[in-house]
Amino acid sequence: MKKLVLIGGGYGNMRVLHRLLPNQLPDDVSITLIDRNPYHCLKTEYYALAAGTISDHHIRVSFPEHPRLDVQYGDITSIDIVQKQVLFQDREPISYDDAIIGLGCEDKYHNVPGAPEFTYSIQTIDQSRETYQKLNNLSANATVAIVGAGLSGVELASELRESRDDLNIILFDRGNLILSSFPERLSKYVQKWFEEHGVRIINRANITKVEEGVVYNHDDPISADAIVWTAGIQPNKVVRDLDVEKDAQGRIVLTPHHNLPGDEHLYVVGDCASLPHAPSAQLAEAQAEQIVQILQKRWNGEALPESMPQFKLKGVLGSLGKKAGFGLVADRPLIGRVPRMLKSGLLWMYKHHNG
C-alpha cells in the first residue's frame, strides 16, 4: 500500500482530500494527514476571531472521514527528504511514498527590533485567540496599533472598529494610499470608510522599532496599549529550514508539475510554493486541483503534460465590518454591500461543502 502524506491541513491539502475521497483514490493508496489541530481552520477569517465578532466554532471545519484516511496530530520539526520522513518533537517519524507540503506561512518581521517580542499576531488560530484576549480586555479609550495595511490589516481594523467603537485604532500603511495595489477608486473608498469610522491611518509609515507599548514610526515613538503585526508573511520555519532551491521570498521553487526538481514524490502547495501569484486560499486550492491530476496520472503510469494550464483566479474580496466590503472580480472593482455579501456567501458555501 502506497502512502500519500499531507503535511498540514490547510486550504490546499483540504482540496486534495475532497478531490481524492471518497472514490478517486486508487485501491493501493492510503492517505495520512498531519496537523497540529483536530480540524481545518478558516485562516481567512482569523481577523474576525481576533476582533471578537465570531467564535472558534464559526471558523472550524471537520476533516473528512474515510477508511483509508488516517489523521495524525503533532508539531512537525523537520522533513527528511532523503529518508522520506516527517519528523516530530514528541513522537515517532511518519514515512511517506508521496507527500504534499502545505504548512502555510508565518509573520515576517523584516528585522524590525522588538517586533517578534512585543506584537500580537493573527497567523494561527492560537495566536488569534491570544490577540482576541488582549483586545477584548482593553479598557475604554485604549489605543490599538495595527502594523501593516494589506488585506489582513484592513479587515482586522474595520472589524475591530465595529466590535469596539470605544477604542482608538491606528493603522500603519507604508504606501501613499491604502491598498495601493488595487484600483484607485477602491483604495479611496476604503480610506474614506476608515476616516468616517474614526480609524486613523498613517500613510508612508516605516516602523523602525517596537518596544512594549510603543511603536516607532520613522524613529518617532507612538504609544499603544496593544500592537498587532500584519505587515508581511514568510514560509513556515520547517520549509525555511529545508535545503532546497527557493525564490527571493523563501518559497520553494517547483517544476511545472508542482514537485521539487529531481524529486517527483514531494510536492508543495499554497503559501510555501513559488508561484506567479500572491499567496491566497484561492491559489492554494487551484494548485491542489492540478496536483491531484498529476498524482493520479503518476499512480496510473500515464504520461504527464509538459506544462499545466495557467491558474485562473476569480478575484479578491475583503470586508469592512459586517455591512460593507470591497473587491476586484474579473478585474472589475466592487465596493459597498455587494462584495461583503459575496464574501459571506462564499464562506457559507465553503463550510457547507467541506464541513
From Swiss-Prot:
Its EC number is 1.6.-.-. Keywords: FAD, Flavoprotein, Oxidoreductase. Binds 1 FAD per subunit. GO terms for molecular function: oxidoreductase activity. SUPFAM superfamilies: FAD/NAD(P)-binding domain. Its cofactor is FAD. This is NADH dehydrogenase-like protein YutJ. It comes from Bacillus subtilis (strain 168). The lineage of its organism: Bacteria, Bacillati, Bacillota, Bacilli, Bacillales.
